[in-house]
Amino acid sequence: FAHCLRVRSRAEVEAFYRAALEAGARDNGAPGPRPEYEENYYACFVLDPDGYNIEAMLNEPAPQG
């Protein structure tokens, strides 16, 4: 079972990750690019105390140009 939270910035992904770990969650993937999902996907993953995976993600628009 998993939950995914869409956020507005990389800073919010990183803040979620830090807050979750401080609250007792376990690391399941530090903040970073996830090109295996999509080219501009940035996310982190934590496991809550019940073992559920929680993701904070940002799918940024492709660069223009």
Which residues fall in each region the model found?
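Glycine-rich acetyl-CoA-binding "A-motif" of GNAT/NAT acetyltransferases
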Residues: 53
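A short acidic/small-residue loop/turn micro-motif
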Residues: 35-36, 59-63
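Vicinal oxygen chelate
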Residues: 3-49
